From Swiss-Prot:
Gene: rnhB
Keyword Transcription regulation: no
HAMAP family on file: RNase_HII_B (MF_00052_B)
Organism this protein belongs to: Cereibacter sphaeroides (strain ATCC 17025 / ATH 2.4.3)
A Pfam family reported for this protein in Swiss-Prot or TrEMBL: RNase_HII
Protein name: Ribonuclease HII
Cofactor note text: Manganese or magnesium. Binds 1 divalent metal ion per monomer in the absence of substrate. May bind a second metal ion after substrate binding.
Molecular function as annotated in GO: manganese ion binding; RNA binding; RNA-DNA hybrid ribonuclease activity
Location relative to the cell: Cytoplasm
Record field: catalytic activity: Endonucleolytic cleavage to 5'-phosphomonoester
Gene3D superfamilies xref list: Ribonuclease H-like superfamily/Ribonuclease H (3.30.420.10)
């Protein structure tokens, strides 16, 4: 069975429609119990596309790091975040869309067409968009965005682990692994935990119920 790889067909179709500044957008960090949600917007240029781009989840960490460096060297890139406070206030979907909108706004070239991973398009964007389900595995620009966003967020979680050791964020990136959940029970919550997420909320409620 042939394994599908991302290609340039979606960008080519947009160029054929007359668009000139075409970018891919993806986010990472919707599922973790801690840390921000991070989005990247990437404008690739034909003839300067790094080899081996793919969905960041399919790549080992060292390869992601190397590709992220290549992308930053040859593409226009913007990375943005939505904070834990925004996630808890808005909900994770709206916070993800906010991070995407911020990433798009941070590009040096105002895009006129955005290829967005998923099936929903953030509201209020001023340019044409196309949502592509599993776009990080189908579209080169989105694959590049997924890699940049993943590397950027992983680095944030490594930094946060130095401030709050014991939760394993360097390896679990804030996801609800068994060790992370056990650390929550043993060490309690940090300011970087998402109170609106059920496992965290349950622990917070338990702590409140036993307080004097």
């Amino acid at each position: 069975m042939e394994i599908a790889c991302p290609d340039w067909s979606h960008e080519s179709a947009a160029f054929a429609e007359g668009f000139t500044c075409i970018v891919g957008v993806d986010e990472v960090g919707r599922g973790p119990l801690a840390g921000p949600v991070t989005a990247a917007a990437v404008r690739l240029f034909p003839g300067r596309i790094p080899e081996g781009l793919n969905d960041s989840k399919k790549l080992p960490a060292a390869r992601r790091e190397a590709l992220a460096a290549e992308i930053l060297a040859v593409a226009e890139v913007s990375v943005a975040h939505a904070s834990v406070e925004e996630i808890d206030r808005l909900n994770i979907l709206q916070a993800s869309h906010l991070a995407m909108a911020r990433a798009l706004a941070g590009l040096p070239c105002p895009p006129d067409f955005a290829l967005i991973d998923g099936h929903l398009i953030p509201k209020g964007l001023a340019h044409r968009c196309r949502a592509i389900v599993k776009g990080d595995a189908l579209c080169l620009s989105i694959a590049a965005a997924s890699i940049v966003a993943k590397v950027a967020r992983d680095r944030i979680m490594v930094d946060l682990e130095q401030q709050h050791p014991g939760y394993g964020w360097r390896t679990n990136a804030g996801y609800g692994t068994r060790d992370h959940l056990q650390a929550l029970l043993n060490l309690g919550l940090t300011p970087h935990h998402r109170r609106s997420f059920k496992p965290v909320h349950n622990i917070l409620y338990q702590e409140a119920s036993v307080s004097p």
